[in-house]
Amino acid sequence: MSPLAFVISLPIRFYRKFLGPLLPKVCRFHPSCSTYAMEALEKHGGLKGSWLTLWRLVRCQPFHPGGIDPVP
């Protein structure tokens, strides 16, 4: 993982460790949005991984059907 991707992943790691267990599992996609974000950052680095994550979060809302959405 690039240094930029690592820094960007810190809030995601915090969410997964401390906030995620307290919240209901409501993600419409598989894998979950946080798992997708970590995979995108590891596979594509900080810039493209962040863009893919942002696009995924925009789609994770009640008007999108969700489904299986692997990291490209």
Curated annotation (Swiss-Prot):
Localization (cell): Cell inner membrane
Family listed: Belongs to the UPF0161 family.
Function description: Could be involved in insertion of integral membrane proteins into the membrane.
Hydrolase listed as a keyword: no
Keywords: Cell inner membrane, Cell membrane, Membrane
Pfam families: YidD
InterPro entries reported in the protein's UniProt record: Membr_insert_effic_factor_YidD (IPR002696)
GO CC terms in record: plasma membrane
PANTHER family per the UniProt record, alphabetical: MEMBRANE PROTEIN INSERTION EFFICIENCY FACTOR-RELATED
Protein's name according to its UniProt entry: Putative membrane protein insertion efficiency factor
Membrane topology listed for this record: Peripheral membrane protein
Main location: membrane
Membrane as UniProt keyword: yes
Domain of life per record: Bacteria
Signal peptide: none
